[in-house]
Amino acid sequence: MEPVMSLALAAHGPPSILEPLFKTVTTSTTTTTTTTTSTTTTTASPAGYSPGYPGTTLLTALFENLTSTAASGLYDPYSGMYGNQTNGTIGFETKGPRYSLASMVVMGFVAAILSTVTVAGNVMVMISFKIDKQLQTISNYFLFSLAIADFAIGAISMPLFAVTTILGYWPLGPIVCDTWLALDYLASNASVLNLLIISFDRYFSVTRPLTYRAKRTTNRAAVMIGAAWGISLLLWPPWIYSWPYIEGKRTVPKDECYIQFIETNQYITFGTALAAFYFPVTIMCFLYWRIWRETKKRQKDLPNLQAGKKDSSKRSNSSDENTVVNHASGGLLAFAQVGGNDHDTWRRPRSESSPDAESVYMTNMVIDSGYHGMHSRKSSIKSTNTIKKSYTCFGSIKEWCIAWWHSGREDSDDFAYEQEEPSDLGYATPVTIETPLQSSVSRCTSMNVMRDNYSMGGSVSGVRPPSILLSDVSPTPLPRPPLASISQLQEMSAVTASTTANVNTSGNGNGAINNNNNASHNGNGAVNGNGAGNGSGIGLGTTGNATHRDSRTLPVINRINSRSVSQDSVYTILIRLPSDGASSNAANGGGGGPGAGAAASASLSMQGDCAPSIKMIHEDGPTTTAAAAPLASAAATRRPLPSRDSEFSLPLGRRMSHAQHDARLLNAKVIPKQLGKAGGGAAGGGVGGAHALMNARNAAKKKKKSQEKRQESKAAKTLSAILLSFIITWTPYNILVLIKPLTTCSDCIPTELWDFFYALCYINSTINPMCYALCNATFRRTYVRILTCKWHTRNREGMVRGVYN
């Protein structure tokens, strides 16, 4: 049995154990006397066994084969030896804990807190991205990728680093060491590249908002994120695993864990440090500097880009004549025109919303000064079979901008409906070039007045009574008419009122409004399917049994005139509606002969002469003047518009669902409430109202500038904090990486300093969720939902406010 035991020991132990048994085998192995003595106590040769034993030759050959095989075995780079040879310089017994027990407890507690905060913060970022649809944007895709990298650092890298730092040595062996280093450097480098991608994304979004955002798709974002992880995967893990085989041996001791080529090859060290840190941080600094410079430039140029400057190439609501309609004491049409460069300073972009700048809404009146109206907006874009006229470059650009602006609006379905209608169905409500309605403003039909040489007869002084426009489709471009001045507008209003009175009081049944059951309606009055008269001071009325004469029965020249509407001659007015008594008389005039309807219309016309025909509607409630009382009453009692299927349906092509719920009319113009109130005071109070207007304007301008400065300052501070935190946490370690290969002294840099700077890089993963996510209000609200376990609830109020404001 003893030879068998010796053979087993020889297979698993050092070859020196066999020396007491067979002195002839000890040719290549030497041991000390102490070792042989302790070994021979358990392996003593029995009696009768001697070096001349017959079995000695066989055993000698066997053991020589075993020892030669072990000596010529494959090289193991992780053990640093061939076969079962041992290296006395590498072992776990050489090092122990470097810190006291109290220090180890404190370090473990701090490391556990940092790791938990890092993991929790990045998990909240990923959950927020998942449960809130508002956060699923292109920019937040980059944040999601960054959160994945930081989560890996907090879950894997930080705990293992804390273990090796507290114990003072690496206890898990070389294979786990290389795996930990590969994952650690992969996640850290991916985190840096994700920061770089975010920097590029913000830079292009600021400097190239139009071209870049068109290419900024989810697929491109996925490609960029994949590139960040792919570069990190190629840069670190392959070299960490393969470097001991490249050099032929592993120089890292078993009780330590670091990348071998950082100490053995200074060229690789410099290259990886430049590629992993110095190049990205340099690019990030440059990009953020450009972003900061562009922000400052825009902040400096902001007064020139505001709506106060007249720039028709960028604004669709600019017109050739900017007038503000106010209430005058006894005038038919009173316009308070603000002169100088301050007349547009109250205008605000559509994207801005402020509680200090509320709005009032006013309808639009279109005036054709005796010429063929200019072609409409859609015909200038879609009509290809018509004769082209020569237009100015400014006019063409203006037309294109208007069509482009309306192409993405919510009422684009109205345009499709208008295309279905024939172009010769008459008039439709024209779309003006004023500021489009916000999405929260309901569309209602408006009354639009047009003056031209319409009919061959039945007019006074060559001017026909104003009509309701039923179509703005004009397939034939016509010359641009001259603009109607304010004096012409006032003269037109006076002539219109007198014409309406004369025509309607004739009593012969041939006027614009006729109560005869056999009379036909020529389009000069408003036809209500319910038989109620909704007239105004400009001669609007109805008959109970009147029939609508389609414009196709008119002469061709008149239809051509009727289809064209001038978009430049646009003035904002409100058509006065009749009182309840007048409406009742007009509705009941069918049985009283021609004189009854004429008298009712005449009374409406006279009422329009006595009261102001232009009135500003304030959003905070009805006006308190006595003249405006009938207007408010009529607007409150106005009946719903006829449907498309009724006998007197009008091809307005507008959504009628909001007409009976909102008294604000179609194509309303949005102006600040301060200007409306101050403008009314200026018309009635003279210099005092003008001073009030200027004070309100200056106060709003100062407050807006202060808000913009605060926003720009906050954005600049956020960008600076992000860049500063990255530089502070990553620079010290990367400086040591470049310094250590250059120094011949291995102990010049203390181990504690290495560990501290290495841990500082991890802290950047803890700061990233705070810098990127907590600066976003939507992230903060989602964090609160997660912490309060409200996973499936939504902030409806915030969503509605974000969509409709």
UniProtKB/Swiss-Prot annotation:
Residue span of region Disordered: 27-47, 302-322, 340-359, 507-530
GO biological process: adenylate cyclase-inhibiting G protein-coupled acetylcholine receptor signaling pathway; chemical synaptic transmission; G protein-coupled acetylcholine receptor signaling pathway; G protein-coupled receptor signaling pathway, coupled to cyclic nucleotide second messenger; phospholipase C-activating G protein-coupled receptor signaling pathway
Any one GO molecular function term: G protein-coupled amine receptor activity
Membrane topology of this protein: Multi-pass membrane protein
Skewed-composition ranges (Basic and acidic residues): 308-318, 341-353
Subcellular location: Cell membrane; Postsynaptic cell membrane
Glycosylation sites: 65, 84, 87
Compositional bias (Low complexity): 27-43, 507-525
Cytoplasmic membrane side: 122-141, 199-220, 288-718, 774-805
CDD domains from the UniProt entry: 7tmA_mAChR_DM1-like
Gene from which the chain derives: mAChR-A
Classification via InterPro entries: GPCR_Rhodpsn, GPCR_Rhodpsn_7TM, Musac_Ach_rcpt
Predominant location category: membrane
Job description of the protein: The muscarinic acetylcholine receptor mediates various cellular responses, including inhibition of adenylate cyclase, breakdown of phosphoinositides and modulation of potassium channels through the action of G proteins. Primary transducing effect is Pi turnover. May have a role in the processing of olfactory and mechanosensory signals; regulation of neurosecretion.
Name of the molecule in the record: Muscarinic acetylcholine receptor DM1
GO cellular component, one term: synapse
Keyword Mitochondrion among record annotations: no
UniProt KW keywords: Cell membrane, G-protein coupled receptor, Glycoprotein, Membrane, Phosphoprotein, Postsynaptic cell membrane, Receptor, Synapse, Transducer, Transmembrane, Transmembrane helix
Highest taxon, organism lineage: Eukaryota
Tissue specificity comment: Intense staining in the glomeruli of the antennal lobes, the region of the nervous system containing terminals of antennal olfactory sensory neurons and mechanosensory neurons. Also a discrete group of neurosecretory cells in the pars intercerebralis of the brain.
Membrane-side (Extracellular) residue stretches: 1-100, 163-177, 242-266, 740-752
Family membership noted in the UniProt record: Belongs to the G-protein coupled receptor 1 family. Muscarinic acetylcholine receptor subfamily.
Pfam families: 7tm_1 (PF00001)
Transmembrane segments annotated in the record for this chain: 101-121, 142-162, 178-198, 221-241, 267-287, 719-739, 753-773
Organism of derivation: Drosophila melanogaster (Fruit fly)
Keyword Transmembrane helix assigned: yes
